[in-house]
């Protein structure tokens, strides 16, 4: 059986790691041991931050919606509750985009949410806690 020399494989693996470490500072970009550790850590950060990006964008959309809704005299929580009661299913990303680019359409959504909240307030639905608390 022929002898297998691993120089080509090792060189290819090292080259792959060093290519991923391009742009790093100091010895992390050209020393295989430090580059490998830095690349591993960067992949961990990338994995974690792909999850965090979703949270960050949702928080941004909520802040934008809240700011736009407060101009209309409502809070974010009441607005979302009103939309649910009105049967309007629009996600927060689209609501945020509508609030920024189409204020008239957003005002109509706020009006329908207010109307749904007022309608439910005026109906005589028995409170579940009335009999329990004395």
UniProtKB/Swiss-Prot annotation:
Gene Ontology MF annotations: rRNA binding; structural constituent of ribosome
Q: Domain of life here?
A: Bacteria
Instruction: List the GO terms this entry assigns under cellular component, sorted alphabetically.
Output: ribonucleoprotein complex; ribosome
Task: Check the record and name the InterPro entries matching this protein.
Answer: Ribosomal_bL20, RIBOSOMAL_L20_CS, Ribosomal_protein_bL20_C
What UniProt keywords apply to this chain's record, in alphabetical order? Answer: Ribonucleoprotein, Ribosomal protein, RNA-binding, rRNA-binding
Q: Does the keyword Transferase apply?
A: no
Keyword set includes Electron transport: no
Question: What is one process in the GO biological process aspect for this record?
Answer: translation
Supply the Pfam families for this chain: Ribosomal_L20 (PF00453)
Q: Which HAMAP family match?
A: Ribosomal_bL20
User: What is the role of this chain?
Assistant: Binds directly to 23S ribosomal RNA and is necessary for the in vitro assembly process of the 50S ribosomal subunit. It is not involved in the protein synthesizing functions of that subunit.
Entry's family note: Belongs to the bacterial ribosomal protein bL20 family.
For this entry, the protein name equals Large ribosomal subunit protein bL20
Q: Which gene encodes it?
A: rplT
